[in-house]
């Protein structure tokens, strides 16, 4: 079993080997994940290599009228989805966002299988949170756009 400390190139290879579609942009260093970006309510989803490990971050656009409800529900969401860090991002002139982040420390090295497991678990949990938030009317639905 070979352990790797992944960089962006290795992640691209592992995603290719797993037939996971991803995209690059000139605005950030992340690998954009279309499978999550296509989920209703999702603004963006990216996989980053950070100094502490891998970060799979997804932003959901919160309806401003639901902000208080989402804020009150954060504790439950974080308990129900322990593999994610879930928090609200408020910026002065932008719509509030619910950020869902999965983190995998990799400085001791990981295998391709460990990465695949982290990726699959994080994508599934993220999709479940997005579906629940849509059901609770926390997010802008496609019909609202």
Predicted segments, located by residue:
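Charge-rich, low-complexity N-terminal segments
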Residues: 1-44
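Long, contiguous binding/interaction regions
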Residues: 123-128
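Short beta-strand micro-motifs enriched in acidic
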Residues: 25, 48-50, 89-91
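Long, continuous compositionally biased terminal/linker segments
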Residues: 36-65
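A short acidic/glycine-rich loop-to-helix N-cap element
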Residues: 106-118
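Short, highly charged C-terminal tails/helix-capping segments
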Residues: 134-145
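Short, internal acidic amphipathic alpha-helical interface segments
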Residues: 55-97, 101
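Long, charge-dense
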Residues: 129-133
């Amino acid at each position: 079993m070979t352990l790797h400390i992944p960089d962006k190139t290795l992640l691209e290879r592992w995603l290719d080997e797993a037939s996971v579609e991803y995209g690059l942009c000139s605005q950030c260093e992340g690998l954009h994940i279309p499978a999550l970006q296509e989920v209703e309510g999702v603004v963006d989803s990216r996989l980053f290599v950070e100094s502490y490990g891998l970060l799979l971050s997804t932003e959901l656009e919160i309806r401003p009228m639901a902000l208080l409800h989402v804020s009150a529900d954060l504790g439950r969401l974080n308990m129900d989805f322990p593999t994610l860090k879930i928090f609200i991002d408020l910026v002065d002139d932008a719509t509030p966002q619910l950020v869902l982040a999965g983190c995998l420390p990799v400085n001791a090295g990981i295998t391709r299988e460990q990465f695949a497991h982290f990726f699959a678990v994080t994508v599934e949990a993220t999709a479940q949170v997005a579906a629940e938030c849509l059901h609770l009317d926390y997010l802008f639905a496609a019909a609202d756009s």
